Every structure is written in C-alpha cells, then in structure tokens.
Amino acid sequence: EYSINEACDLIDKNLQKNTYKVNFTGGEPLIQHEAVSELAKHVKSKGIPTYLESACFDSKKFLHVLPSIDFVKIEFKTIDSKFIDAKHYPNLIKNTLECLKASINANKITYIKIVVSSNTEFSSFNELVDKIFKIASKENISGFIIQPTTSISEPSLEKLIEFYDSVYPYYDQVRIVPQLHKIINAP
C-alpha cells in the first residue's frame, strides 16, 4: 500500500518520454475514487492526458473524478451478465447511464464498452443499446466497443454479428475487440 505522495513518486519515476496517457483501470478504479482523483491531477500537472475505464457503479464517485480525466471508457453490463445480481441491476444501470450523460456533458472523449458472452440475450443487449442512445449519439462519443468474453462462455461469431448489427444503426464505427489481456495471459 502506498500513500498518494509515494504513488505520485512511482508515477514520476516510471514515466517514459513517449508516455502519451496514463490509464486508471483494472478492478474498479471508482472504489478508490479520491486516490484516483489525486493521482489524475498529478498526471495532468505533467501535461499527460488521463484515461479512466470504469463500470460506473456510483455516479457521485464518478463526478468526483471526472474533472481530472480526459478520456472515459464506460463499461456497461447487460442484465443477464453473470457478474451482476439482477436485483441490483436497475441501480447499476441508472448510475452507469448518469455517468455517460455526465461524461458527454463535460465534453470528455467518451467510449462505450459492453462485454458480451454466450449467455447475453439479444433482447437485453438491444434494450441496453436503446437506453445508451437515448443519451449518446454518434456526434458525442468516440467509440463503441463490443467485447466478447474469452475462454469462458465465448459468444459465437453469429451472435457477435447480431450484437454488431444492433449497434450499427446508431453508431457506424462500432468495433468488436477481444479481451486481449486474457489472450496474452496478462494479470
């Protein structure tokens, strides 16, 4: 465990001349939103852009961090995700949509990601996409990523194409990007 000052020193010691951004991701950065905010401020003071990837489970914590972030990737979960308790889903999706709206309103470079598996139902995916594009549009997001799970419950190519086809009318630059960290066995 490190203090904020120790973490800032570690960042400073490890910056390379070609460092073009610092990512706050892995696990869930908003669990430590105050630390992320301080570290992001430090990074920005060096003239380096900051990037946050989050499931946005708490819009208040997200709003605390947002002023110090340049790029935001918001990860949405479908109601049939194995990682979500269905009774908590309405609150999660409410918070995630509020974070999307806040990011867009703050003119952040905003990306959307939905992780899908063989268990993801087309109807729940479609419903989520409809909710997202009641807030977002092709003019105010910079990317839409569909990320298939790797190894466990991998969706078929046909299913991925169906998901792609449901996003395409809203956003024609939709991408399907695998979980590279799992493919290369990164932690």
Predicted segment positions?
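Conserved alpha-helical substructure of the radical SAM core
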Residues: 1-22
